[in-house]
C-alpha cells in the first residue's frame, strides 16, 4: 500500500529503582495532576510548551485536549513552584505517548511525578531520533533501551519531508554542510542541502542516486539505513529522524 517501516524511535524502560538511584539528580519537586480543559490559562501554558518543541503538532486549545485523551490517553499537567513546567500524555499503565517539558533538566523530576501519580512499576518513555537533549538527560535513568522504526509511513513529498527532518536534526547536533541529490521513483530530482545549519531542498537537473520508494524510505528515514549500504551522504545526515508523537497520529 506504499507504507513502509520508517522513522526513528528510541524507547526507554524506567523502573522505580532507576529513579531511586538518581535522587541526587533532583532539581525541583514536581507534581502531576489531570489537566482541566476549562482552565484557559493552564491550556495556554501547555500549548506554549508544545509549540516550543523542535517538532510538534499544531492545535487549537479545544483540539489539544481532544487529541490528548484519544485512545484512552491521560493528560497530566506537571507543575513546579506553582508554575506549569510540562505535560505528560500517558496510559494508566505508564506507557508514555508524549512528555513535553519547559526544560529538559526536569526530566528526572517529571518521571518521578508521573510514576508517583500513576502508581505503576514501569514507565516506558519514547524519544524522537532528533531529540539528543532528551537522550542525554535520560541516559543515567533507564533500565533498558531499544531502537525501533517508529511506524509505517508513506511520504508524498520527499523534498519537503527530507528538508524538514534534516533541519530538525541540525537543530539538535552539529552536522556538516553538504549536498545530496536524489530522485525517487523517477520523479523530478532534488538537491537536499545543509548550509550553516539551514536545510533546504530544491529541484535539480540530475540525481546522484535514483531510488525506488522502498529504497528511499529505508535509506533516508529508517533504522534499516544504519545497516544497509549507504548513499554517499555527508557524515551524520542519515537516517533522517522522521518521528511523530503517538498522540498526534490519532
Where are these regions (language model features)?
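Active-site/acyl-donor-binding loops of N-acyltransferases
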Residues: 2-24, 101, 108, 112-250
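Amide-forming acyltransferase catalytic core, primarily the GNAT-like/NAT-type
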Residues: 4, 8-116, 128, 158-174
Amino acid at each position: 500500500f506504499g507504507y513502509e517501516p520508517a522513522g526513528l524511535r528510541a524507547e526507554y524502560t524506567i523502573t522505580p529503582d532507576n529513579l531511586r538511584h538518581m535522587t541526587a539528580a533532583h532539581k525541583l519537586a514536581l507534581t502531576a495532576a489531570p489537566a482541566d480543559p476549562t482552565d484557559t490559562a493552564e491550556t495556554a501554558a501547555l500549548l506554549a510548551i508544545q509549540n516550543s518543541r523542535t517538532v510538534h503538532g499544531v492545535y487549537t486549545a479545544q483540539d489539544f485536549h481532544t487529541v490528548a485523551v484519544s485512545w484512552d490517553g491521560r493528560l497530566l499537567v506537571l507543575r513546579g513552584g506553582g508554575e506549569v513546567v510540562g505535560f505528560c500524555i500517558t496510559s494508566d499503565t505508564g506507557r508514555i505517548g508524549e512528555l513535553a517539558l519547559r526544560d529538559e533538566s526536569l526530566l528526572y523530576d517529571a518521571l518521578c511525578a508521573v510514576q508517583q501519580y500513576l502508581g505503576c512499576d514501569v514507565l516506558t518513555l519514547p524519544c524522537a531520533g532528533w531529540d539528543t537533549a532528551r537522550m542525554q538527560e535520560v541516559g543515567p535513568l533507564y533500565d533498558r533501551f531499544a531502537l525501533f522504526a517508529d511506524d509505517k509511513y508513506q511520504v508524498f513529498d520527499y523534498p519537503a519531508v527530507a528538508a524538514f527532518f534534516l533541519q530538525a536534526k541540525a537543530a539538535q547536533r552539529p552536522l556538516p554542510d553538504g549536498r545530496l541529490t536524489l530522485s525517487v521513483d523517477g520523479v523530478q530530482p532534488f538537491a537536499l542541502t545543509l548550509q550553516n545549519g539551514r536545510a533546504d531542498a530544491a529541484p535539480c537537473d540530475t540525481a546522484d542516486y535514483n531510488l525506488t520508494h522502498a529504497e528511499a524510505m529505508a535509506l533516508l528515514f529508517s533504522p534499516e539505513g544504519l545497516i544497509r549500504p549507504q548513499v554517499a551522504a555527508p557524515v551524520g545526515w542519515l537516517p533522517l529522524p522522521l518521528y511523530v508523537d503517538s498522540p498526534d497520529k490519532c
